[in-house]
Design a protein with these regions (language model features):
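Core dinuclear metal-dependent hydrolase active-site scaffold
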Residues: 1-56, 156-159
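Short, active-site-adjacent cap segments at secondary-structure transitions
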Residues: 3, 116-118, 153-155
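A generic structural signal for short, non-catalytic loop/turn and secondary-structure boundary residues
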Residues: 3-5, 138-140, 150
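Residues at the C-termini of beta-strands that transition into short coil/loop
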Residues: 14-16, 60, 149-151
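Cofactor-binding loop segments of dinucleotide-utilizing enzymes, especially the Rossmann-like FAD-
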Residues: 39, 113, 150
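Cap/insert and terminal regions of metallo-dependent hydrolase folds
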Residues: 45-146
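Short, basic/aromatic-enriched C-terminal tail that caps enzymatic domains
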Residues: 143-159
Length: 159
């Protein structure tokens, strides 16, 4: 249920992952809204609704599917990562951006990028290509992409 941290309204929402009650979060304060969803095996319509009308998004771009398939993980781990209860791939995020993204968010943070099964540049290029292929090319550059990192802070936005 909804809770507050000072004036910040936080709305948890259910995501698909193989954990006990996994959630993403939607944040609202003074007319600014954002959402964060990592550890998501799929980006379904229910999650897409929580991401709508946000000024910024932080979404998982965990892996390149081919890198997982040829990588060193045991088969059962590969199957888990690639499943709808695993992690969101670059391609799955790109599909969301091309087909379900409402284009309100001006900033998209690519998050939870696997060191073993992804490359930040591949994740970035996949998302950028999806935005550029959108049917409304004038909007392609209206959403700025940002990489997040496991060992250092990301940029801070002044919204």
């Amino acid at each position: 249920s909804v809770f507050f941290i000072g004036d910040l309204q936080v709305t948890p929402f259910t995501v698909s992952h193989d954990a006990a009650e996994p959630v993403g979060f939607r944040f609202s304060n003074n007319g600014i809204c954002g959402a964060l969803a990592t550890d998501i095996g799929e980006l379904n319509n229910t999650i897409a609704k929580q991401l709508a009308d946000c000024d910024w998004l932080g979404l998982e771009s965990n892996h390149d599917e081919e890198m997982v398939k040829i990588g060193p993980y045991p088969l059962h781990v590969k199957q888990r990562v690639l499943s709808s209860k695993g992690h969101l791939s670059n391609q799955e995020l790109a599909d969301f951006l091309a087909n379900k993204f409402d284009r309100k968010a001006k900033h998209l943070f690519l998050a939870h990028i696997s060191r073993q099964n992804n490359d930040p540049q591949i994740a970035l290029e996949s998302a950028q290509k999806a935005l550029e292929e959108e049917k409304l090319p004038l909007l392609a550059n209206s959403c700025k992409l940002h990489l997040t990192h496991q060992t250092k802070p990301s940029i801070v936005l002044d919204l």
